[in-house]
């Protein structure tokens, strides 16, 4: 995932003072000339405009100034957050074994192309978390193209409650005011996987446009007793264009 930073002050039409809001991000070079910036309204997590960066100037380990190539888009002001849209990698994760993982097997939040295929998951929290927020951890990355296919999700998955572990696959961006008209994530396909489930929550999804859950095999496992407060197999919040089909 990337890192969101907050606009603290608009110094001029082309200069903004920003701050790393999470101390584990402090000290990094947030961006470089000609890279693309997304401007995000933090309550809805909607990217309202984009721009180009001319210069990055660190003031200290937490604060920095960004000079823009053109004036700040209308309406963007102090309190908005910025995301570097250039530094967003693709990810191919194949033939891996995720075992003895404390919180999650994978945390994936990038607009790049993501393929998660032919893996075995035995994590104690969610096997896969797709997150994104600009309010707590400030982890950026609204996904645009994610394929989760032919993986084996075994019974330890989601056997303990950790932060954001709402289901075996948890799509859980932190959005104070979700807007169904403008979903945060899009184009997520979960297909041809096998789930060995001792508990009920299989999939939790918030703020997704274009979600497919199809041709998956669901096997009841009795190794542990169900404990999760969610009793539904699939929970959807502020989603649209959802297909759930041919699961068995």
Predicted regions and their residues:
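A structural micro-motif recognizing beta-strand termini
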Residues: 17-26, 66-72
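Extended Gly/Ser/Thr-rich low-complexity repeat segments
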Residues: 24-44, 72-93, 190
């Amino acid at each position: 995932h990337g890192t969101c930073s907050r606009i603290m002050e608009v110094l001029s039409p082309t200069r903004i003072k920003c701050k790393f809001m999470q101390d584990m991000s402090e000290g990094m070079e947030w961006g470089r000339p000609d890279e693309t910036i997304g401007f995000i309204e933090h309550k809805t997590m909607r990217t309202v405009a984009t721009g180009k960066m001319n210069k990055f100037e660190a003031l200290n380990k937490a604060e920095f100034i960004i000079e823009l190539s053109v004036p700040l888009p209308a309406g963007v002001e102090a309190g908005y957050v910025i995301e570097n849209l250039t530094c967003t990698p693709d990810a191919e994760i194949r033939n891996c074994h995720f075992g003895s993982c404390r919180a999650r097997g994978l945390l994936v939040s990038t607009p790049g192309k993501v393929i998660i295929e032919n893996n075995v998951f035995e994590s104690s929290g969610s096997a896969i978390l797709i997150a994104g927020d600009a309010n707590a951890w400030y982890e950026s990355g609204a996904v645009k193209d994610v394929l989760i296919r032919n993986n084996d999700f075994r019974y330890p998955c989601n056997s303990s409650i950790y932060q954001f572990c709402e289901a075996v696959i948890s799509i859980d961006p932190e959005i104070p005011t979700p807007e169904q008209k403008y979903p945060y994530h899009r184009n997520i396909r979960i297909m041809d996987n096998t789930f060995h489930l001792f508990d009920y929550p299989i999939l939790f999804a918030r703020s997704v446009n274009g979600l497919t859950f199809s041709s998956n095999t669901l096997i009841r496992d009795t190794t542990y007793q169900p404990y999760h407060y969610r009793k539904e197999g699939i929970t959807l919040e502020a989603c649209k264009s959802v297909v759930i089909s041919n699961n068995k």
